[in-house]
Amino acid sequence: MKTIPSFTIDHIRLLRGIYVSRKDEVGGETVTTFDIRMKEPNREPALGQGALHTIEHLAATYLRNHPIWSDKIVYWGPMGCLTGNYLLMKGDLKSEDIVELMQETFRFVADFEGEVPGAAPKDCGNYLLHDLPMAKWESAKYLHEVLEHMTKDNLYYPTKE
């Protein structure tokens, strides 16, 4: 079998950041998949499942209600490796295009108070698996350490050596 593109990224050198993972043509429109990498793979602990699940609920809710970008949002969801999230958006976009949006999103999560949207038995398949305090902590860490100090190394995948 062919190696899928995401397995060809050098995870040893990959930093936290926002990366274009792929672009696909769907029904005549480009869909851009972003790698929202919150943890350096294999070099720092992965996100806790409860924190990542809560980030998923809060970020998806925020993005789908965003006054400018909501009509471009296709999907937000966690990576199986627990090092970040995938964001699928309509349009032929670059990482730089969504830095401000990601700053707003992670600021929203970091500052969130109250009941997590969709975290009830009738709304969620694993409603007990939430950790708002850690979601806020991880989001603030990512915002202040990465999103507020973006460089090309946080926007473009490492090149092959």
Swiss-Prot record:
Residues binding Fe cation, per UniProt: H53, H57, C124
Catalyzed reactions per annotation: S-(5-deoxy-D-ribos-5-yl)-L-homocysteine = (S)-4,5-dihydroxypentane-2,3-dione + L-homocysteine
GO molecular function: iron ion binding; S-ribosylhomocysteine lyase activity
Enzyme Commission number(s): 4.4.1.21
Keyword Iron: yes
Keyword Transport: no
Root EC class: lyase
Cofactor note (record): Binds 1 Fe cation per subunit.
Cofactor(s) listed: Fe cation
Residue pairs linked by disulfide bridges in the UniProt entry: none
Pfam family, one: LuxS
Family of this protein: Belongs to the LuxS family.
Binding partners and assembly: Homodimer.
Database matches in NCBIfam families: PRK02260.1-4 (NF002604)
PANTHER family: S-RIBOSYLHOMOCYSTEINE LYASE (PTHR35799:SF1)
Protein name stated in the entry: S-ribosylhomocysteine lyase
Phylogenetic placement of the source organism: Bacteria, Pseudomonadati, Bacteroidota, Bacteroidia, Bacteroidales
